[in-house]
C-alpha cells in the first residue's frame, strides 16, 4: 500500500457484515481479505480479524475491527473498508458503533439455520442507520443447505427481494467474486468534503504499552495529516498526530486520511481518560467542526461484584479494569467493600455473556484470580417519601416497611423456534413470568414468539434453557422496554446470626421460599464444621423463611468414664454444653471462597 493513502471518494466503499452469532462473518471476512490480495498465503490463518485470544478460543467475535482492502475492477482500484462486528446480543453497542461508520451492510444468513433472532435485530439496526443492505446467504456448500427456503424467510421477516440475495460459501470461496462486485455496485460511496474543516468519529480504541492509545477513526469531513495538531472535542485535549494509517489487517502507516476513509491515529496518549469512544476529532484551533451526534450510551443491564482472590491484587485489578475500559467503554466499575470478600469493584455489564467475557479477559490479560458475586439487575425503588432511586446491589435495598413501589426492568424477547418446539418454549417463558406479545410464522416450519419477561429471569440461564428445550435450534434476542412494578423482596442469608452481604439477592416473593431453602441447603453442605453448631438462615426482613443447621464437632468427653454413677457423665456433658455456648457467642464462622463460589455458580 502506498504511503499516501488518500483517493477519490467515488472509489471508496465502507461496509460491515452483520449476522447472528456463528453464521460465518469472520470466515467470510477471511475470504474477502484473500480474494482482494490483502493477505498472502504466508500471513493466512483462520478468523484473521478475531485477534483477541478469547475470540480465537471461543470462535466468536467480541470487538469490532476495521480493515482496508484494495479491489481492482475494469482498471479502477477501489478501497473497500470492512468493519467486522460481533453477533451476540450483549455486543449490540459494538454493532451500533460500526454501523455509524458505514454506508452499506452485508446481511449474512446461514443457508441451513435460516433467519435467527439476532439477524432480525441487526437488520433493523442497519435500517435505522439508513444503510444499504446487501442480503447474503452463506454456507451454500452444506449438504443440508436450503437457500431457496431461507431467501423466502428473509423476504417474510425482513422484506428483502429473494432475487437480490447473493449466494456464497465462505468456506470454499464460491460466490465471493460476485459479492465483491455487488459491494462496489450496491454500496453508495461516502459523502463529505475533503477540503472542509476536519471532523472524524472515534469508533474504537485500544491500548498499547509502548505507543499509548491507538484510536480507530472514520473521517467524515476534511483531511487529517501526520504532524497535525488535533483536538478531541469531548475530552477537550489537544495532541499531535505522530502516526496515522490503515489496517490491512495489521497497521500500515500513511501520510493522510481524507473524508470517507477509515483508519487509525497514534498521538502518544498515555492518559486513559483522554480517549472516549464516540468522541469527535477536529483541528486544534479557534473554530473546530461541530461535534458529531455521539452513539447512544449503552445501558448497563447486569451488575456483579468482582473481588481479587488475594487481597494484595486490589491495585493490580484496578489498573487492569482501567486498561480494559479504554478498549471496552460499555462496562463501568466503582470500588466496593464486602465483609466477606474484602475490597473489590462493583461492575456494570450489557449482559451475561459480556460479564463472562470481561472476567475472562481480566484473568487472561492481567493474570489475576477473581471471585464474582451473583449477578443482579438495576431496580427502581420509590420510598415512602416519594424519592425514586436506582439500586444496583441487593445490600442497598431498604427494609420492606420503607418501600412504596418496587419496579423491575422488563425486556422484550424475540424467540425464533422450529414449530415442533413452540409448546416447551411457551411453557418456559410462562414459568419465567413472561407475558406473550406476539406469534409470527416465518416460513414453512419456524415461528417467532414475542414475550415481555423480567430481565432478572432472563440473565441467569434463559438462553441456555431455550437452547436445551429446542435441541439447540432456538435463538433469543432481547431489548429493554422499561420498568414495571412487581412483588419483589430482598432475600438475606444469615450465618450464625450475621448477614452475609455477598449472598443477598432480590427475587420475586413467590419464589423466595424455594430459593432461600436451596441456598441454605447448599451452604450447609459447603460450610466446614466448627466446635459449635452453626445456623444457616434465609430471611426476608426480620422473618426467617428457611433454616439449616451445620452440626458441631464434639469430643466424646465421657470416654474415660466406665461404670460408676450416671451423674458423673451428666456433669461432664453439661460442662461441654456450656463451653460450646460460650464459644458460639464469641466464635466467628469463616466461609471459604470455595463455599461462596459453590453457591454463586449454582444457578440458584
From Swiss-Prot:
Pfam families: EFG_C, GTP_EFTU, GTP_EFTU_D2, LepA_C. The keyword Cell membrane applies. The keyword Acetylation does not apply. It is a peripheral membrane protein. One of its GO terms (cellular component) is plasma membrane. Its EC number is 3.6.5.n1. It comes from the Bacteria. This is Elongation factor 4 1.
Amino acid at each position: 500500500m502506498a504511503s499516501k493513502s488518500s483517493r477519490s471518494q467515488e472509489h471508496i466503499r465502507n461496509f460491515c457484515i452483520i449476522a447472528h452469532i456463528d453464521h460465518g462473518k469472520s470466515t467470510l471476512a477471511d475470504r474477502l481479505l484473500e480474494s482482494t490480495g490483502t493477505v498472502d498465503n504466508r500471513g493466512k490463518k483462520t478468523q484473521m480479524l478475531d485477534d483477541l485470544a478469547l475470540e480465537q478460543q471461543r470462535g466468536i467475535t467480541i470487538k469490532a475491527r476495521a480493515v482496508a482492502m484494495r479491489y481492482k475492477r475494469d482498471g479502477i482500484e477501489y478501497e473497500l473498508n470492512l468493519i467486522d462486528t460481533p453477533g451476540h446480543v450483549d455486543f449490540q453497542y459494538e454493532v451500533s458503533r460500526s454501523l455509524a461508520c458505514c454506508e452499506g451492510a452485508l446481511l449474512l444468513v446461514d443457508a441451513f439455520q435460516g433467519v435467527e433472532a439476532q439477524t432480525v435485530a441487526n437488520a433493523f439496526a442497519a435500517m435505522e442507520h439508513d444503510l444499504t443492505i446487501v442480503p447474503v446467504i452463506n454456507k451454500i456448500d452444506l449438504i443440508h443447505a436450503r437457500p431457496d427456503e431461507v431467501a423466502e424467510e428473509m423476504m417474510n421477516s425482513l422484506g428483502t427481494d429473494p432475487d437480490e440475495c447473493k449466494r456464497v460459501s465462505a468456506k470454499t470461496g464460491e460466490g465471493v467474486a460476485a459479492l465483491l462486485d455487488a459491494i462496489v455496485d450496491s454500496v453508495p460511496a461516502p459523502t463529505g468534503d475533503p477540503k472542509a474543516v476536519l471532523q472524524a468519529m472515534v469508533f474504537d480504541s485500544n491500548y498499547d504499552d509502548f505507543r499509548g492509545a491507538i484510536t480507530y477513526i472514520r473521517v467524515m469531513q476534511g483531511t487529517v495529516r501526520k504532524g497535525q495538531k488535533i483536538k478531541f472535542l469531548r475530552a477537550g485535549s489537544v495532541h499531535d498526530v505522530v502516526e496515522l494509517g490503515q489496517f490491512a489487517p495489521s497497521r500500515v502507516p500513511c501520510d493522510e486520511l481524507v473524508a470517507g476513509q477509515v483508519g487509525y491515529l497514534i498521538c502518544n496518549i498515555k492518559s486513559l481518560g483522554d480517549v472516549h469512544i464516540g468522541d469527535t476529532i477536529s483541528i486544534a484551533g479557534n473554530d473546530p467542526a461541530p461535534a458529531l451526534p455521539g452513539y447512544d450510551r449503552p445501558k448497563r443491564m447486569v451488575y456483579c461484584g468482582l473481588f481479587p482472590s488475594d487481597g494484595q491484587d486490589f491495585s493490580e485489578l484496578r489498573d487492569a479494569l482501567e486498561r480494559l475500559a479504554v478498549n471496552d467503554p460499555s462496562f463501568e466499575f466503582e470500588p466496593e467493600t464486602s465483609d466477606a470478600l474484602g475490597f473489590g469493584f462493583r461492575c456494570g455489564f450489557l449482559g451475561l455473556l459480556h460479564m463472562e467475557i470481561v472476567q475472562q479477559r481480566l484473568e487472561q490479560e492481567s493474570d489475576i484470580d477473581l471471585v464474582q458475586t451473583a449477578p443482579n439487575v438495576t431496580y427502581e425503588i420509590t420510598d415512602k417519601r416519594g424519592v425514586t432511586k436506582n439500586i444496583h446491589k441487593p445490600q442497598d435495598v431498604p427494609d420492606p416497611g420503607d418501600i412504596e413501589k418496587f419496579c423491575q426492568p422488563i425486556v422484550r424477547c424475540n424467540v425464533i423456534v422450529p414449530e415442533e418446539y413452540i409448546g416447551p418454549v411457551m411453557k418456559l417463558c410462562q414459568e419465567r413470568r413472561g407475558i406473550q406479545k406476539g406469534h409470527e410464522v416465518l416460513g414453512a416450519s419456524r415461528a417467532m414468539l414475542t414475550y415481555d419477561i423480567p430481565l432478572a429471569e432472563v440473565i441467569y440461564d434463559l438462553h441456555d434453557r431455550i437452547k436445551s428445550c429446542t435441541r439447540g435450534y432456538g435463538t433469543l434476542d432481547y431489548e429493554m422496554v422499561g420498568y414495571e412494578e412487581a412483588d419483589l423482596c430482598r432475600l438475606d442469608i444469615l450465618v450464625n446470626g450475621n448477614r452475609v452481604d455477598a449472598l443477598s439477592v432480590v427475587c420475586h416473593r413467590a419464589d423466595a421460599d424455594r430459593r432461600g431453602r436451596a441456598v441454605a441447603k447448599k451452604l450447609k453442605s459447603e460450610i466446614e464444621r466448627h466446635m459449635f453448631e452453626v445456623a444457616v438462615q434465609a430471611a426476608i426482613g426480620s422473618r426467617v423463611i428457611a433454616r439449616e443447621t451445620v452440626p458441631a464437632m464434639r469430643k466424646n468427653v465421657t470416654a474415660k468414664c466406665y461404670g460408676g454413677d450416671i451423674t458423673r457423665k451428666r456433669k461432664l456433658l453439661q460442662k461441654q454444653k456450656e463451653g460450646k455456648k460460650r464459644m458460639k457467642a464469641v466464635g466467628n464462622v469463616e466461609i471459604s471462597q470455595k463455599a461462596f463460589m459453590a453457591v454463586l455458580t449454582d444457578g440458584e
